Amino acid sequence: MKNKFKDSIDNANVYDAASRTPLEKQINLSKRFKNNILLKREDLQPVFSFKIRGAYNKMKNLSDENLKNGVIACSAGNHAQGVALAAKILECKATIVMPKTTPTIKINAVESHGARVVLHGETLHECFDRALVIQKKEGSIFVHPFDDEEVITGQGTIAKEILEDYSRPIDAIFCCVGGGGLISGIAAYIKAVKPEIKIIGVEAQGADAMTQSLKANKRVVLDSVSLFAEGAALKQVGELSFKICQQYVDEMIVVDNDEICAAIKDVFEDTRSILEPAGALAVAGVKSYIKKNNVDSKTFVATASGANMNFDRLGFVSERAEIGEERESIFAVTIPEKPGAFKDFCSLIGKRNITEFNYRYSSESSANIFVGIGVQNFDESELLMEKLKKASLEPIDLTHNEVAKLHLRHLVG
């Protein structure tokens, strides 16, 4: 595929709607990981997401006649707000089809820009079908969230800003991947200007459609999708974005929910800003890459792609961040039901912090406990596991068991 995006990105003017966001060094994260880690702050956009770039670039290139007919989009969040704000600036009608399960705060954000919201179905696939019906009836223009040349061009302006703002060598740029629009725009521009810079995509475990598609050399459809990083949770990537990624993306990384939560905490500690899970994917990817490849003294850029966090998720993020940093391990342990048994267990734990403790009566002879223990890393966790085994306490390491972390820790009695 010929790279036709470089010139169009150079000439794209998205700044009537989007902000030129800063590229900031993450002081604490860089020090901890012994690399120069920079954050492209797309969370500081007017709609708290990079999506405004692509939506506005698509819409400002529509004819007056098309703008008069209005635009339509389907989205559960960030793209919806981008289209709504772009429509407000361009003074055209906008209809956004959103799932019935969309949080009220996101619906209100879209409506605050004057867009009409249509609630339909439970999934984005159902919303897409409904949007096409409305489009045909009203003659409006569909603004695709990622699989569109002008949308991809708009997202690519991020890459242009990165190179303009940082003149020294960059080893890799990390991007979150959902449908593939963001990484396509960045990759196409970077490979045309600085092809030596690696482009690395990051997906959430259970929502890795691009990773699987690149391995299969064709677009795959996931049977189901993990919704924790909902802003990047899609069953299938775009046709155009897949072709671009095949040509220009160097590597894909998949991270789990705990790693995402830890990345949210990392960014908060450096910036006092809270990213949404999809917005922190790139940071989680940088950390995973450094650990896996044991590199230091490199320069990495991570795109902070969004900050439309649902407030009720903060407790979950805080709870899981320590596991993501390998600072907490979760065990199920069987102890004798007799006086002094818990004291003996605590002696085995030593001076380590017990972060949580749940007791369940099992029988007259034994009891089951669910315990969180502070550790320095998972190597220490393995040593503790062996120590508990030698004491015949039948320990089970549940640190990476999603069902246990979501449900068992809340059982009592």
Question: Which role does the model predict for each range below?
Answer:
Residues 1-413:
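PLP-dependent amino-acid enzyme catalytic core
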